[in-house]
């Protein structure tokens, strides 16, 4: 099983071809392709390749499936004995991203199986 660890949105995510992941919002249209170049680690049949901090020439390519918003997070602040109440909500934007392939130096290391 081949996988890669990428950095996107300030977070590190373990990704595999053929699966989708919810990552921080990307400014790409739905059904648009996007390439992530911040690849920290690649594991395949030949072994593990670790970058310092990134692997030169390694990319993860994928397709944007959907642009969504997460569930609402409520923030409630109150001061006792002061009749002060604040109730606010926040919905974070995120992108549902399907991983198509993992490449190193232009060579495909892993790709999703077309069914």
Swiss-Prot record:
Keywords: Ribonucleoprotein, Ribosomal protein, RNA-binding, rRNA-binding. This is Large ribosomal subunit protein bL21. GO terms for molecular function: rRNA binding; structural constituent of ribosome. It comes from the Bacteria. Belongs to the bacterial ribosomal protein bL21 family. InterPro entries: bL21-like, bL21-like_sf, Ribosomal_bL21, Ribosomal_bL21_CS. HAMAP family: Ribosomal_bL21 (MF_01363). One of its GO terms (cellular component) is cytoplasm. Part of the 50S ribosomal subunit. Contacts protein L20. This protein binds to 23S rRNA in the presence of protein L20. GO terms for biological process: translation.
């Amino acid at each position: 099983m081949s996988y890669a660890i990428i950095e996107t949105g300030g977070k590190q995510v373990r990704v595999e071809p053929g699966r989708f992941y919810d990552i921080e919002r990307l400014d790409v249209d739905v059904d648009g392709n996007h390439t992530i170049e911040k690849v920290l680690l690649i594991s395949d049949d030949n072994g593990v390749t670790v970058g310092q901090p990134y692997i030169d020439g390694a990319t993860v390519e994928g397709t944007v499936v959907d642009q969504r918003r997460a569930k609402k997070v409520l923030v409630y602040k109150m001061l006792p004995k002061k009749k002060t109440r604040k109730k606010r909500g926040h919905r974070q934007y995120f992108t549902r991203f399907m991983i198509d392939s993992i490449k190193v130096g232009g060579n495909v290391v892993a790709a999703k199986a077309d069914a």
